[in-house]
Amino acid sequence: MKLVLLGAPGCGKGTISDYLVKNYGLVHLSTGDIFRQTIDQKGPYWEELKSYISKGLLVPDELTNKILKNALDKNMDKSFILDGCIRTIAQADFLSTILDIDLALYLEVPFDVLEKRLTGRRICSKCKRIYNIHYSAPKKEDICDDDGEFLIQRKDDQKEIIDERMKVYRTNSEPLIKYYEKLNKLVAINSENLDDLEKNIDDLFINKFNLRKIA
């Protein structure tokens, strides 16, 4: 199975990716991980890639496509999830030239829920445990339950940054939903309630692909 995961920041892509890896044996491929590995291992195009990232610039589609192809070539014999790897129509067009995806899974969440998930997120400065002040708050405000260290809010989770991320998402990524819909590859799942999301995924995989959990 080759699966593209779509959805706005905070929609639950990381959560559902972990679930699919553990319960269905899929390999998780994300742009962030691929970029970090390319730079750390000094892989093909690493210097050009590092020059963009170190300046805080968006990596151009052409360079992203080259690096993504290199990663995909190593995993073509496996079932995998592409998480955040396809962000523009140009990238989707390129992907279609090297493989035929089975499913584009779109995680739908209302904007106000996304905002609460992201702005409410806090991370332990030591153990990196993740909390949310709205949904899973620590017992003591701003203090980690496990080690007593202070909780921090990532810069990316501040409202001003989130508003900008959502603007970029709507401009570049929302057209992908229509793109895969026209190809009859798109399946939308409401992920507002994360507790129901796993069951919805299980039902989809059984009904559409006759796949059951390996665990």
Curated annotation (Swiss-Prot):
Tagged with keyword Manganese: no
Entry EC number(s): 2.7.4.3
Catalyzed chemical reaction(s): AMP + ATP = 2 ADP
Residue ranges of the region described as LID: 120-157
Enzyme class: transferase
BP GO annotations: AMP salvage
One Gene Ontology molecular-function label: zinc ion binding
Binding annotation for Zn(2+): 124, 127, 144, 147
Pathway: Purine metabolism; AMP biosynthesis via salvage pathway; AMP from ADP: step 1/1
Localisation: Cytoplasm
Sequence positions that bind AMP: 31, 36, 57-59, 91, 154, 165
The UniProt record lists the keyword GTP-binding: no
Keyword line: ATP-binding, Cytoplasm, Kinase, Metal-binding, Nucleotide biosynthesis, Nucleotide-binding, Transferase, Zinc
Residues that, per the record, bind ATP: 10-15, 121, 130-131
Start and end residues of each stretch annotated as NMP: 30-59
Family per similarity comment: Belongs to the adenylate kinase family.
Subunit and interaction comment: Monomer.
Domain notes: Consists of three domains, a large central CORE domain and two small peripheral domains, NMPbind and LID, which undergo movements during catalysis. The LID domain closes over the site of phosphoryl transfer upon ATP binding. Assembling and dissambling the active center during each catalytic cycle provides an effective means to prevent ATP hydrolysis. Some bacteria have evolved a zinc-coordinating structure that stabilizes the LID domain.
Function: Catalyzes the reversible transfer of the terminal phosphate group between ATP and AMP. Plays an important role in cellular energy homeostasis and in adenine nucleotide metabolism.
Protein name: Adenylate kinase
Record organism: Malacoplasma penetrans (strain HF-2) (Mycoplasma penetrans)
